[in-house]
Amino acid sequence: MAKRSSLYIRIVEGKNLPAKDITGSSDPYCIVKVDNEPIIRTATVWKTLCPFWGEEYQVHLPPTFHAVAFYVMDEDALSRDDVIGKVCLTRDTIASHPKGFSGWAHLTEVDPDEEVQGEIHLRLEVWPGARACRLRCSVLEARDLAPKDRNGTSDPFVRVRYKGRTRETSIVKKSCYPRWNETFEFELQEGAMEALCVEAWDWDLVSRNDFLGKVVIDVQRLRVVQQEEGWFRLQPDQSKSRRHDEGNLGSLQLEVRLRDETVLPSSYYQPLVHLLCHEVKLGMQGPGQLIPLIEETTSTECRQDVATNLLKLFLGQGLAKDFLDLLFQLELSRTSETNTLFRSNSLASKSMESFLKVAGMQYLHGVLGPIINKVFEEKKYVELDPSKVEVKDVGCSGLHRPQTEAEVLEQSAQTLRAHLGALLSALSRSVRACPAVVRATFRQLFRRVRERFPGAQHENVPFIAVTSFLCLRFFSPAIMSPKLFHLRERHADARTSRTLLLLAKAVQNVGNMDTPASRAKEAWMEPLQPTVRQGVAQLKDFITKLVDIEEKDELDLQRTLSLQAPPVKEGPLFIHRTKGKGPLMSSSFKKLYFSLTTEALSFAKTPSSKKSALIKLANIRAAEKVEEKSFGGSHVMQVIYTDDAGRPQTAYLQCKCVNELNQWLSALRKVSINNTGLLGSYHPGVFRGDKWSCCHQKEKTGQGCDKTRSRVTLQEWNDPLDHDLEAQLIYRHLLGVEAMLWERHRELSGGAEAGTVPTSPGKVPEDSLARLLRVLQDLREAHSSSPAGSPPSEPNCLLELQT
């Protein structure tokens, strides 16, 4: 049993930001930190005070996180980036909004004294003395302190205050993981109410010392427990007066939703999974209660989530095609007009969208990737609408005359015809590259629609049904927003975005089979009509070949594609492998091409190199970040593993940005999460000379000074399926609509009492709805009887001691 937390984050836009550049504008981007750990960086939106990002992320993290902060920054090419402001949401604030926090939040000024992070290890004792009780405070060590100096470290010391007396530890130079092991004693007076204050500071020779955080201990509670030892989270100084600058720094529109799930062992979900799978296997031949009932009881706002959870569950069971086939039949049974077929946001439409994103994303990248990259690289000005043509944007400098409007329109049409032709040609050649399960699903869709709407007058309807998903809900959205489909790392600029929009419109016209209705909407698209008409013929030929797959061919193709399984993650990185003593600088990194599969992390000089080295996946013990000071550069991670002889080794890898760093860390953590011997602690520094750079510990193989973060990952489109989590999410949804399910059960069983499902032998066998209600009841009891998931990082007694 495990407790899991997921944070859905959507950074929408900003408004009324202050100008940071001499041009009267800014180049804003966002950094997202969870407990002061940077995990996300948005794209930079250039030269604007009202940026739009529209970026979505989902982060899996331990349930013990405390806060998520959004920093709006101004990018500068020549100097350090400026901080515009921040929005901080505590875990409690997010959890108080069951449907998620959504809306505008004012940016506030970043106060260095509030940028507190890390924990301090204390041993606290109350023991009797000759005249009065004594309070003993042992300051042992600290970890993950905020780096306050330019070299990426701090020079921390601790100040302990009680009843007007102040004691200080020694200063540990250049460390965010200091060890003191110093003890201070104070005399306790009976009935004294004053608290013990432990403050961490960064010592500075010239300027004032920087505040690193504090812990305030309730001495009266400590008297009761007599002795306590543990890690205490450092807190900001709440006594400081806050500046009232809300609104002066602009606002940020956010959507943040927290989902906490307690996932039971697989055996608990088997009855639910078996029941749903049985319903799908029966299809329209059986009573068919559950799937239609789930659709009926699912609200519009959560339909996409429910569709995705069901789709992933059945995909893991090998029943995705059968599940979607059942939904196709249900939707066709209630559709009489061909022009409304699969155009609503039904469970069938949402499930098919999710299916294509889960099963067809690699295929999409193979078809669209080269075309999208070419559009981004060319940066051509493209416009077909005469009312929007701006000749000045395309004028030729030097001796050449500016282009006329007619020339701009003709050149734009030629460019779009070339892109559309290249896309359709790539699509026509891609039949064998399409996953077998996707082809088989489209085959079922094509057949069901043709059976429902036979006759020559409906000849195009099966083709339009396929293109309504393939073109209108998959290819066109990916063309318009390539970053959201992982085709590009950054959003398109205004010029490229317009080209992509026009190309997406052309693809939609082809997908609509060039109907008169689609042509009448925008007459200025007429120059593309010859290519569109030719594309319709190409697309129909492609679909005919796509759906021409039999069961045997499906199995053979699936087997072939599975042998060509793509890497989990690949790309160029810089590597430095430890070689004992000597300085480690960023210049010693060597660029290699890395490929992570479910078997190993391999690396070579080029992607096509025959000779490569590898780290076996089963040997990986941790994947963590490295302190910036260690190599004089940021975005460095370490892969800790054992070689074939069982000796511990470390490979240091440098990424180009914080997003790439976290993507690689996420991928490595996901594929190694079930490894035996995973580390619980590690050193975020390097062993230089005769000691670790982080904590100055001299024992190379000693216990790490920081805890590992193997559960902190980013959700990606190619994540492995988690059957237990999907089953838990479906259970949680059904539990939310249980009252509606009982109401339907009473209707079907002639007014039986809610909560009374027949169980006696000899009675009529339970129908599927009654069995579902019983399964929900059993799961509810399993949740209530099982202990809570992972223990919190701080015992309750430590939290109670802090005031």
From Swiss-Prot:
Residue stretches making up the Ras-GAP domain: 318-546
Chain positions of site Arginine finger: R343
Residues the record lists as binding Zn(2+): H683, C694, C695, C705
Binding residues annotated for Ca(2+) 5, in chain numbering: D149, D202, D204, D210
Cofactor: Ca(2+)
Domain notes: The PH domain does not bind phosphatidylinositol 4,5-bisphosphate or phosphatidylinositol 3,4,5-trisphosphate. This lack of binding activity is due to Leu-592, compared to Arg found in other family members.
Protein name from the UniProt record: Ras GTPase-activating protein 4
This protein's encoding gene: RASA4
